[in-house]
């Protein structure tokens, strides 16, 4: 055993950083090149098809078959120009990672020729084998079929020579077999409830989106040892640079990188995005991390608690509610009216955490998380809301001073005093 370890250490010392050639010095020159974003849709779609797709994305309207055919043709043309040969419905089963079933654009004809085919029916639905994935008891053993259904709110992207189409994953009976469908339902419910409240303050608000900014922690270990290593700082930087380049090609706005507490533990973070897209990007990031690490003779450890006695890795996220008019509903305002709106959402968020802590905890329950939570590191195993001293005192004052259940003009005037300050950490 010791000779194997020494041999691995010797091999590790001989390894050099692998440099990846990144074209140009401006990220803006290649950011999102492998993503079928809205500006690219405009290039490949008719005005009518583009408008109908935007209506589907923005309002949830059903998309007709003709429009789906137009979108499929546009995706095929764009992706084939970039060297793509296959497409896949990219989904998020109950495994904590993603899954794919690849199909070729290539279709043989009866006269011996062939063509590339991709139409609306192939875009909208696929049928992977649901028996290959956990179901939580929602799928009968004799109902092996599962269905993936296109999620138009998250843009398609290219990995290698494959066009990846974000989808939900459901059973033969229509039950969710993934993490995306419950998320989309929750986002719709929050939008509906928050928009109704916002209408009391601003009639121009017709949509509230949940925004999400996540962090991904990970351990990076040399593949020849996997559990021990000498210093590899130069190689880590080369790995990070290539990983960020590959992420930017996929439209993932990674902006932050730094060391974490444990030896050879690191963290990355992107700019916040709409929550469904941010969730997709986090799933995609883990795959990019794995593939890039192997090119640099590393192994990525994404497990929440890979080492005993050493702090683990986690996904910390910062979420908010944003209206279509650009207002962050969880940010204190600058006048009594906007502060009253902030307080409305603020106190209801705290109440929701208090009343639904068990459901919130259950939604993040995994074996890995159970190993980590409460083990002398953040976060603890309880669900709590830390408000900071300033906001706590403000709520105490409101509770003490407003006795009749209604706010006097003086109470409303007081709302403009100091609430706009940042809560203390």
Label every PLM stretch briefly:
Residues 2-7, 25-31, 50, 260-267:
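Short N-terminal helix-initiation segments at or just after the protein's N-terminus
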Residues 64-68, 89-90, 118, 269-271, ...:
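A cross-family glycoside hydrolase active-site/sugar-binding cleft signature
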Residues 84, 100, 108, 136-139, ...:
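Short, surface-exposed, charged/polar-biased interaction segments
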Residues 12-120, 124-140:
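Histidine/acidic residue-rich metal-binding segments in metalloenzymes
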Residues 71, 94-95, 262, 308, ...:
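Positions that flank functional sites
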Residues 1-24, 141-157, 162:
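N-terminal hydrophobic targeting/anchoring segments and the immediately downstream early-domain regions
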Residues 144-302, 311-425:
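Glycine-rich, acidic/polar active-site loops that bind/position phosphate-bearing ligands
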């Amino acid at each position: 055993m010791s000779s194997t370890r020494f041999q691995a250490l010797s091999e590790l010392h001989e390894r050099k950083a692998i440099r990846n050639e990144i074209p140009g010095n401006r990220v803006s020159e290649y950011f999102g090149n492998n993503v079928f974003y809205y500006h690219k849709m405009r290039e490949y779609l008719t005005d009518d098809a583009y408008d109908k797709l935007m209506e589907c994305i923005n309002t949830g309207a059903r998309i007709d078959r003709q429009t789906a055919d137009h979108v499929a043709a546009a995706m095929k043309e764009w992706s084939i120009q970039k060297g793509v040969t296959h497409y896949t419905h990219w989904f998020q089963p109950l495994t904590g990672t993603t899954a794919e079933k690849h199909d070729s654009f290539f279709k043989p004809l009866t006269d011996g020729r062939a063509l590339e085919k991709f139409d609306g029916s192939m875009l909208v639905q696929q049928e992977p084998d649901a028996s290959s994935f956990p179901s939580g008891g929602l799928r009968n053993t004799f109902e092996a079929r599962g269905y993936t259904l296109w999620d138009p709110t998250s843009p398609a992207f290219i990995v290698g020579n494959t066009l990846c189409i974000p989808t939900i994953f459901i059973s033969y009976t229509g039950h969710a077999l993934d993490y995306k469908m419950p998320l989309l339902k929750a986002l719709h419910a929050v939008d509906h409830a928050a928009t109704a409240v916002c209408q009391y303050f601003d009639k121009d608000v017709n949509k509230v989106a949940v925004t999400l900014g996540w962090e991904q922690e990970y351990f990076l270990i040399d593949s020849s040892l996997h559990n021990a290593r000498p210093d590899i700082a130069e190689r880590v930087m080369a790995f990070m640079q290539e990983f960020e380049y590959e992420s930017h090609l996929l439209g993932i706005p990674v902006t932050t990188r730094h060391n974490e507490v444990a030896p050879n533990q690191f963290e990355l973070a992107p700019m916040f995005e709409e929550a469904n897209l941010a969730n997709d990007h986090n799933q995609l990031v883990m795959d990019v991390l794995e593939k890039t690490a192997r090119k640099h003779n590393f192994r990525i450890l994404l497990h929440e608690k890979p080492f005993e006695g050493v702090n683990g890795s986690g996904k910390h996220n910062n979420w908010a509610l944003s209206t279509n008019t650009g207002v962050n509903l969880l940010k204190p305002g600058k006048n009594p009216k906007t502060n009253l709106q902030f307080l409305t959402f603020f106190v209801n968020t705290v109440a929701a955490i208090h009343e639904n802590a068990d459901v919130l905890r259950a939604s993040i329950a995994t074996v890995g998380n159970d190993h980590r939570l409460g083990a002398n590191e953040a976060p603890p195993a309880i669900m709590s809301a830390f408000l900071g001293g300033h906001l706590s005192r403000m709520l105490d004052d409101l509770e003490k001073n407003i006795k009749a259940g209604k706010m006097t003009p003086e109470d409303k005037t007081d709302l403009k005093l100091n609430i706009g300050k940042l809560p203390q950490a």
